[in-house]
């Protein structure tokens, strides 16, 4: 009897790695934009931090998006997330350009970045599961490590992108934003189109195959994941970590300036 051959998912895996890179890039770019926005839009420190408020406020939609994913599937959520990211960046390009010279330009910028953030939330729901299923199970840990490494590389590249493409020795003005954001929007839509036309496995496939065993073992587990104390401790730890990850790069430049 011949062994079942694992399909070659190299190309889809590369695309998903690009998505992981994009998640880290956009998230760090958002933090790196705060000092630029404060000067370009003439903001106070409090107003500048609205960039983070609007972006990370989108994560409250993670549970509704997870429910949506269970209905439309992983691939549709992945494509939709990239499409929303692309629309958000392009809307930022069009909206900021249209609102230049008005008091509403910063509000338009924030609203469009919140759209981008909604897309990023969708991508974070599905990226890691796809990394795990796009290849042999025994190399899943390696793929996951590589995807997180790319995410970390993106956090280094994003500030360089901001300084060389958006700032680049030019005056810090709102009109410097639309061009680069249009490029990012088009790039996200191109990746979405590629993923739409390629075949991807369902990360829930193994779960469905093992449903019988899961039912048999159900009595070993509590009725809800929230009944496990370490889930709450884990959530608290992540919240504290995010406060450090976001707070330090967002606040430190202002601290350096005043000191």
Annotated model-derived regions:
Residues 50-70:
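Central cavity-lining transmembrane alpha-helices of secondary-active solute carriers
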Residues 1-10, 205-234:
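Juxtamembrane intracellular "pre-TM" segments in multi-pass secondary transporters
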Residues 1-23, 39, 100-101, 105, ...:
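Cytosolic juxtamembrane N-terminal segment immediately preceding the first transmembrane helix
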Residues 83-103:
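C-terminal ends and interior cores of transmembrane alpha-helices
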Residues 102-123:
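Hydrophobic core of transmembrane alpha-helices in multi-pass small-molecule transporters
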Residues 137-138, 143-203:
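Helix-loop-helix hairpin linking two adjacent transmembrane segments in secondary transporters
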